[in-house]
């Protein structure tokens, strides 16, 4: 699996991923020698800038009035946790998490598929509704994976969790537009959000682990 990135605009350092991908890159080079000039399949991955936090109490169980009171009571907390979530699970962390997964295998793409991490798309209407390709590539074997949501929730009964939404677009049929395979994954959190600065590292590791599990839940369903 070859890994590329076009995220220079947001300054992502991919050194660790490059080291991890080295054996696979060697395999790709060796494979190319035996398969000739065969065109590799392409997977383009788009992380998201979307981040939301939602804290609710037992008030939400008392209809609209309770939900309104609950939202008002937790407004400041939700804003601060959303800001932290956007920073802690921003594009470079999403890429780090996805870099630990064999995306080609999980998405059932051909061996030797090149993986390119693209810059996030700010317009949600494009990322969630556009059925055409989001890059200029005209490769006949082409697919896209988009992360479209990171949602942190804290509920009075169920506790804390991270939920993510993904979209997979497979253009291998030769169509200019394709179906958007949408889905989600959700897993519990133990350390996020951190209560002190000493807990920041554990909280961010908690988020990354949950994000990875969420993707594997999604990929298993497609």
Describe the residue ranges of each PLM region.
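Bacterial N-terminal signal peptides that target proteins for export
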Residues: 1-11
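Structural alpha-beta junctions
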Residues: 110-115, 168-176
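Surface-exposed short loop/turn segments
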Residues: 27-29, 122-174
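A structural "domain/chain start" motif
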Residues: 24-112
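Short, solvent-exposed, polar/charged sequence segments at loop or secondary-structure edges
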Residues: 88-146
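Short secondary-structure boundary motifs at beta->alpha junctions and helix caps
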Residues: 79-88, 172-221
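Hydrophobic, Leu/Ile/Phe/Ala-enriched alpha-helical segments that form helix-helix packing faces
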Residues: 99-111, 168, 211-222
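N-terminal signal peptide c-region/cleavage motif recognized by signal peptidases
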Residues: 15, 21-23
């Amino acid at each position: 699996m070859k890994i590329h990135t076009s995220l220079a605009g947001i300054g992502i350092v991919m050194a660790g991923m490059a080291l991890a991908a080295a054996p696979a890159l060697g395999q790709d080079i060796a494979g190319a020698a035996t398969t000739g000039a065969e065109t590799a399949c392409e997977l383009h991955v788009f992380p998201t800038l979307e981040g939301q936090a939602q804290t609710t109490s037992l008030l939400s169980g008392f209809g609209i009035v309770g939900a309104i009171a609950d939202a008002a009571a937790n407004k400041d907390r939700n804003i601060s946790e959303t800001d932290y979530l956007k920073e802690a699970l921003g594009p470079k962390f999403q890429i780090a998490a996805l870099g630990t997964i064999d995306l080609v295998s999980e998405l059932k793409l051909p061996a030797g598929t090149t993986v390119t991490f693209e810059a996030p798309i700010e317009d949600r209407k494009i990322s969630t509704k556009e059925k055409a390709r989001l890059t200029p590539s005209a490769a006949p074997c082409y697919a896209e994976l988009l992360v479209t949501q990171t949602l942190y929730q804290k509920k009075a009964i169920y506790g804390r969790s991270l939920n993510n939404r993904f979209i997979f677009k497979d253009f291998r049929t030769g169509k200019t537009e394709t179906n958007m395979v949408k889905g989600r994954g959700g897993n519990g959190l133990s350390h996020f959000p951190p209560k002190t600065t000493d807990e920041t590292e554990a909280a961010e590791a908690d988020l990354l682990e949950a994000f990875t599990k969420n993707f594997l839940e999604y990929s298993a369903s497609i």
